[in-house]
């Protein structure tokens, strides 16, 4: 199986600079591989670090230690040490992040929301919608919800 995301030794602490540099550990030494076609669930109580992990995988948060490698253009890119332009390219074409606080525009079909990134990359409307249909089907989202 093709590894799409490989996480090794990932740790994240938040530093409270206004309180003398107190460190709050969120997670430490996390290892995770996600392969093509897998569906992964992050499960845990509020405050366990699920959202922090996702933000670290997307390079919104800089980890305290470890590596986040994402398959991009046939090779693995380590987002913990990548140049900003590389992070933008990986986000543009290889990995996405949807916040749990997503707010969508009423009356815009989910199909169009999913197709939008392809349109922004230059795909014509119909091929973008075809790809969006394929993705929504792979996620087993009923067509009545599109």
Where are these regions (language model features)?
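Short coil-to-helix segment of the ABC ATPase nucleotide-binding domain corresponding to the Q-loop/switch region
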Residues: 108-117
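ABC ATPase NBD coupling module
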Residues: 21, 76-96
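Conserved ABC transporter NBD signature motif
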Residues: 66-78
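The feature captures the beta-strand-to-loop junction immediately N-terminal to the Walker
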Residues: 43-45
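Helix-to-loop junction immediately C-terminal to a conserved catalytic motif
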Residues: 58
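Conserved ABC ATPase "signature" region
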Residues: 78, 126-144
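Conserved structural motif at the start of ABC-family nucleotide-binding domains
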Residues: 5, 27-29, 90
């Amino acid at each position: 199986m093709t590894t799409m995301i490989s996480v090794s030794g990932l740790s994240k602490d938040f530093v409270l600079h206004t309180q003398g540099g107190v460190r709050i550990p969120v997670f430490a030494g996390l290892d995770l591989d996600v392969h093509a076609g897998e569906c992964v669930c992050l499960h845990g109580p509020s405050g366990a670090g699920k959202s922090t992990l996702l933000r670290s995988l997307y390079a919104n948060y800089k980890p305290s230690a470890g590596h986040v490698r994402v398959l991009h253009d046939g090779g693995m890119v380590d987002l913990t040490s990548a140049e900003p332009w590389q992070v933008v390219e990986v986000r543009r074409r290889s990995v996405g992040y949807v916040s749990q606080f997503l707010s969508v525009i009423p009356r815009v079909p989910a199909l169009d929301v999913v197709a939008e990134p392809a349109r922004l990359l230059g795909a014509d409307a119909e091929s973008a919608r075809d790809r969006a249909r394929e993705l929504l089907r792979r996620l087993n989202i009923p067509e009545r919800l599109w």
